[in-house]
Amino acid sequence: MKKRKLCMIFLLCLALMTLVVGCRSKKETNDQGNQKGTAIYYTNNDVTKLIMKKENVKLEGNQQQKVKILLKKLQQTPKSNKIRAVIPKRIMINGVSVNTNIVEIDFSTGYKRISENRDLICRAGIVYTLTQLKDINYVSFSISGEPMLDTDGTAIGALGRDSFVFGKLPMK
């Protein structure tokens, strides 16, 4: 009888803890959702970190138009002199298309000249900015119509938010 009572108390405490944890995480999610604006990712001047800023961006039209609006924003020089655009000024975007849940971006050949660190920050900033759009889960990159390759010469493929490891991608 005593064992059964202890077991019931233990199960009740466990259920209560689960309920409390579930409520807390929901509240944290709601708090983050209360920040108004669209998340635009920039980098610091040393190009070592991604920095997210919420901005009021007028996203109108179909998915393709929204993607183009966000890409233009990622190319613009920010007002603050402490951050930079993730897409360097000298990099041109040849084309953009949206196919189901994947955005395909084709860069000019100038993209091949950016440093490895700048490349990582650029791709991560683009992926994090575009995948906040409804039904966009991945971004695929190419250079002058050819698939983008990693340092080993392997095609990078479509990248999602989970493609970047936070230990390797500093964020602020």
Model-identified regions with their sequence ranges:
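Bimodal "functional hotspot" detector
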Residues: 2-13, 17, 21-172
